[in-house]
């Protein structure tokens, strides 16, 4: 069996993550796990934050099981936090998988243009995003280092209070709502 790859798409909304994830899905025969598609299917116009984390966690569990079975997987969430990326890098390593991290960035003007175009062309696949939300999210985004992207940088230790990245992952992405 060949070594599976976990592809991580990293970036803010409308930067090209899902477009790239769809290409990776086909080119690498990968299971693509795109949170927004699941949120829309399950919640429609609603976008409850409590459900978002649970859906991400369930999709991660599915993706990690697929890796254990030897399949390539694309996690298409944004992964704005370094801890999120470290937890997934460690989970992949624990399962003998490679990680390919792809970071996507566009100018704020291009992002706004893409968001508006998406809202016009395929409103059923997205939610309206205000400029205020974009600015808040950009401030929260922890841009990956070049070492994170290439894999040459060691995976950080889990944050204080967490013995392992698996324990942190279960806390970050809870198994159920509530």
Feature roles, as predicted:
Residues 9:
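Hydrophobic anchor at the beta1->P-loop junction of P-loop NTPases
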Residues 37-39, 80, 105-111, 160:
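Conserved nucleotide-binding/hydrolysis micro-motifs of P-loop NTPases
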């Amino acid at each position: 069996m060949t070594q599976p790859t976990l592809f991580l798409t990293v970036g803010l909304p409308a930067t090209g993550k899902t477009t790239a994830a769809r290409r990776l899905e086909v080119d690498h025969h990968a299971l693509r796990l795109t949170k927004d598609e699941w949120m829309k299917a399950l919640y429609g116009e609603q976008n409850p934050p409590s459900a978002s984390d649970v859906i991400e966690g369930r999709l991660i569990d599915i993706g990690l099981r697929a890796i254990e079975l030897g399949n390539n997987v694309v996690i298409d969430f944004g992964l704005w936090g370094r801890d999120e990326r470290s937890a997934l890098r460690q989970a992949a390593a624990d399962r003998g998988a490679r990680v390919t991290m792809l970071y996507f960035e566009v100018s704020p003007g291009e992002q706004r243009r893409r968001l508006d175009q998406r809202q016009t062309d395929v409103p059923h696949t997205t939610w309206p995003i205000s400029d205020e939300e974009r600015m808040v999210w950009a401030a929260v985004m922890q841009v990956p280092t070049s070492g994170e992207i290439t894999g040459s940088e060691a995976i950080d230790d889990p944050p204080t209070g967490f013995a392992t990245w698996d324990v942190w992952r279960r806390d970050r992405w809870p198994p159920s709502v509530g």
